[in-house]
Structure formats: structure tokens, C-alpha cells
Amino acid sequence: MSTLGHQYDNSLVSNAFGFLRLPMNFQPYDSDADWVITGVPFDMATSGRAGGRHGPAAIRQVSTNLAWEHNRFPWNFDMRERLNVVDCGDLVYAFGDAREMSEKLQAHAEKLLAAGKRMLSFGGDHFVTLPLLRAHAKHFGKMALVHFDAHTDTYANGCEFDHGTMFYTAPKEGLIDPNHSVQIGIRTEFDKDNGFTVLDACQVNDRGVDDVIAQVKQIVGDMPVYLTFDIDCLDPAFAPGTGTPVIGGLTSDRAIKLVRGLKDLNIVGMDVVEVAPAYDQSEITALAAATLALEMLYIQAAKKGE
């Protein structure tokens, strides 16, 4: 079975239309795209409420509400005029085979990166970030991680496929450097001795955005950065449609401002994960995810326009 655009892809949640109504391209490796969007409809590693496999479709669907604005506020330019972005649809794999998903996603990412493309990926549960990190580390070397989440996902439970273990595994594999990595919005228990800088939700909500960004930049330095945003970083008032919601999170306004503040970092890959639309209200979680994804593209476009 091919990785993209297979005629026998029997998923009910794949490949309806592109993010922001961007063109679909099932052969992105040979395209002239700068950034390639890939959906990963996978939720077998979920510990809470399942349904993240429907996340990519929900993000794409609600993104049509964002497609009309050309000179987007407050950027005052159209990202699409500076970046060539294509959507290659969803990863096709044998549903029920977590190992195949992981291997195919890593191979897909490696092929895109070798062709000079950058990736914005939509989960799916947060486990999908691990094969993406493996591919990016092969191409860019050890990276810094900027991680928005309610949970650190550094738990060691011995399970190969678990959306709470990726950032325990990634440092051990040499993919990321915890000493140059930041976890933002955390509000569950975590290990204070694993090297990561944790900016918990209490302090992020109380501190100024510029102050937080300055600390992030200081920690990350000039390392290549992988940016991952678990939508449960947001308070459930702003993102109820997720598998493991935790009260006391960030507002959507604060999250957007923090993402915009990352513009000067050397970001080499990005993802937005853990949207589970079955638990959403009026698509507000999917809209938050789509908006954050769009802001991620805008910070790339802003650098290209300088």
C-alpha cells in the first residue's frame, strides 16, 4: 500500500480537501513546495479518550473559515504569497498497526526532508511526534524541542507506543537535547531532574508573554528547533475536544502570542496534535488548532519576507 493518495485508502477521515483550501499534492517529494502539510490519523497510543485520528480532518474542515483573510491580522500580508505550501493529505497505513504507522511516517518525513521540504504535521495523538523527531534528527542532527502541552510526556512506562513517553525516549535516542528544550503550559506531575526547562501553566499565565519568550530564546539558542503543540496546552474552556483535558491551561490568545514570539528561532519542523473532535463544542478546539497551525506558517513566512 502506498503512503499517500492510495485508491484503496478506506479511512473515513482522510483526504477530503486541503488545509486552508491549499492544493492537494500526493507527490510532494518532487514538488516546488517550501512546506508540506501531512495529516496523521492515528490514536492507538492514547491513554485517555480516543478520537484523535479524526483530528486532521477536523482541522482541515474548520480551516476554511480562515482561508478568506488575505492580509491576515496583525501580520498584514498573505502567507500564501511568501511560502509555497501544499497539503499531501493523510498518511495511509494499515489501521491497527502502530508500528507500520511509525515506520511509514518516518520514511515519509525523511523523503520530504531529503528533498528540501519542511513539514507541518497534524495529529493524531502525540505519539506521532516521535517518528517525526527521528526523521528530523537524521537530517538536522540533535535538536531543541519547544513543546506546548499540559503534560511533559516524559513518562517511562515501558510501552513502545504511548503518547506520554515520546520525550522520555527522544533524549535517549539522541534526537533532542533536554538542556536546550522548553516545555510550556505543563500542569501535571513531572520529573524535575531530566534536564528539560518546564514553564508550568501557573507561571506562564502570570508572566508577561515577552518575558516568557525571552527565556525560551535564551534556552534554545541557535539550535535547530522542533515545535510541537498539543492542543491540551489550552484550557478546556478553549479546547474541550481533546483526549486528556486539564483545567488551568493557557488561553488561545496567550498561546497565539507565544507562538508568534518564536519567529526568530531556527524552527525546522512543526506539528499540532491531540484534537479529538468528538468531544468538541462548535468546532472551537479544531479552530484553535487550525489557527495555531496557520500562525506557525506565518512566522515562517515573516522570516522569508525580511
UniProtKB/Swiss-Prot annotation:
Residues where Mn(2+) binds: 126, 149, 151, 153, 230, 232
Classification via InterPro entries: Agmatinase, Agmatinase-rel, Ureohydrolase, Ureohydrolase_dom_sf, Ureohydrolase_Mn_BS
GO MF annotation: an example: agmatinase activity
Pfam families, A to Z: Arginase (PF00491)
Catalytic reaction annotation: agmatine + H2O = urea + putrescine
EC numbers, comma separated: 3.5.3.11
Cofactors demanded by this protein: Mn(2+)
Enzyme class: hydrolase
GO biological process: putrescine biosynthetic process from arginine, via agmatine; spermidine biosynthetic process
Domain of life: Bacteria
Pathway(s) this gene product operates in, as recorded in its UniProt entry: Amine and polyamine biosynthesis; putrescine biosynthesis via agmatine pathway; putrescine from agmatine: step 1/1
Keywords, alphabetical: Hydrolase, Manganese, Metal-binding, Polyamine biosynthesis, Putrescine biosynthesis, Spermidine biosynthesis
The family this protein is said to belong to: Belongs to the arginase family. Agmatinase subfamily.
HAMAP family: SpeB
Function of the molecule: Catalyzes the formation of putrescine from agmatine.
The protein's name in its UniProt record: Agmatinase
